[in-house]
UniProtKB/Swiss-Prot annotation:
It comes from the Bacteria. Pfam families: Hexapep_2 (PF14602), THDPS_N_2 (PF14805). CDD domains: LbH_THP_succinylT. Its EC number is 2.3.1.117. Coiled coil: none annotated. It comes from Rhizobium johnstonii (strain DSM 114642 / LMG 32736 / 3841). Belongs to the transferase hexapeptide repeat family. This is 2,3,4,5-tetrahydropyridine-2,6-dicarboxylate N-succinyltransferase. Its main location: cytoplasm.
Length: 286
């Protein structure tokens, strides 16, 4: 699709979103066609909710998020087939795999293990592996990435190439508020079991999160080497574990010292060469 065509789609969707109170299941014509085209672009990986520039900055295509939101107004509830024992679900978003056969899967080039759930408009790149997991609408999963058992990739989340999302990992989705950016895991990251990255935080390339690390916008990210405290972004090639920080001189009502509070700790930085040659368990040993 040409830049002119994309600009035309964006214009229609922006206008429809501004007038969204009048968009419903009866809406036909260019609004419905534009939303369907936008969802098809997302589903095929030809458009992304967020894109990384050469300087590392991420640009959010808000109009694509708006297209996803408009689809909820346009689509009525319907039966979704495919449950165990011929059971069904009741939803507005069909499966990405609806009506797929062998040819579709071979062309797509990724593995979809039984009981994984991928909603329409999520893109899964070739050589990715989906264990029984959940990938929400508008998300992007890069080439060679493993989404392990019970991991969740939230709406519009961006997962890079050769990422490992371990068992039970949660990557938060962001559709609203509209100005919020999606949660982003860049290329070659390892996210340890049961960790959570949410609220539009960014884990930069090559980073390793140990098991049970939780990072949201208000989470303190502490560099052990420097004492620097940052929020919302883990630098490239960082090794991060769960930790805690003292509450200063604060005391509780009973006069006892206040409890330490959770933080994420950058215990070391590694270069790309070391990261590629060193086992994850070895990196996490202190």
């Amino acid at each position: 699709m040409s830049a002119t065509d994309l600009a035309s789609l964006e214009k229609i969707i922006e206008a429809a979103f501004d007038n969204r109170d009048n968009v419903n299941t009866s809406t036909k014509g260019e609004v419905r066609d534009a939303v369907e085209s936008a969802l098809d672009l997302l589903d095929a990986g030809k458009a992304r909710v967020a894109e990384r520039s050469s300087d590392g900055a991420w640009t959010v295509n808000q109009w694509l998020k708006k297209a996803v939101l408009l689809s909820f107004r346009l689509n009525d509830m319907d039966v979704v087939k495919g449950g165990s024992g011929n059971s069904t679900w009741w939803d507005k978003v069909p499966s990405k795999f609806e009506n797929w056969g062998e040819n579709h899967f071979r062309a797509a080039g990724f593995r979809a293990v039984p009981n994984c759930v991928v909603r329409r408009s999520a893109y899964i790149a070739p050589n990715a592996i989906l264990m029984p997991s959940f990938v929400n609408l508008g998300a992007y999963v890069g080439e060679g990435t493993m989404v392990d058992t019970w991991a969740t990739v939230g709406s519009c989340a961006q997962i890079g190439k050769h990422v490992h999302l371990s068992g039970g990992v949660g990557i938060g989705g962001v559709l609203e508020p509209m100005q919020a950016g999606p949660t982003i895991i860049e290329d070659n990251c390892f996210i340890g079991a049961r960790s959570e990255v949410v609220e539009g935080c960014i884990i930069r390339e090559g980073s390793v999160l140990g098991m049970g690390v939780f990072i949201g916008k208000s989470t303190k990210i502490v560099d052990r080497a420097t004492g620097e405290v940052t929020y919302g972004e883990v630098p490239p090639y960082s090794v991060v574990v769960a930790g805690s920080m003292p509450s200063g001189n604060a005391t509780m009502g009973n006069g006892q010292p206040a409890p330490h509070l959770y933080c994420a700790v950058i215990v070391k930085r590694v270069d790309e060469k070391t990261r590629s040659k060193t086992g994850i368990n070895e990196l996490l040993r202190d």
